[in-house]
């Protein structure tokens, strides 16, 4: 899995390394990428998760802060990593479940994450990045992979009866509309357009 953020000539690069033996042992690495005459060069490899177990789904909160899901004590919580200091801090501790897919909510300091409770209940929550206090964003929708389009509209891969469904949610009017059935996990905004991309499995 790759997550790239451009910054003029140089950029920061994430690479998730999975163990050949166990897919649950993953790490999040940080690189400097320098543009050269032949292309790009990776330098200064740094394992920023450095944790046994599941570490995945990195997301830039801002130019100096990264979010990712990381396992501890048998569950998965949200980590905030500060680039210039190397500080790593868990922002929440959910006793009855775990979090995945952390993202910053546009025009907000809060973040969202998918919470999977031990009971099997799966929902999208909002978290205060400092206190970790959370609240449910979309009731009764089993969000698996969210994509924020703006601060009140998001597209999600939602778990349906037999496959993932592409759902558009508008928080201003509490609407959820199924746009496509049988899609993949990958949702992205297309740069410099008003479009998003998704994988259709039809």
Where do the protein language model's features map onto the residues?
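Sequence signature of WD/YWTD-type beta-propeller architectures
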Residues: 22-202
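Bacterial Sec-dependent N-terminal signal peptides
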Residues: 1-25
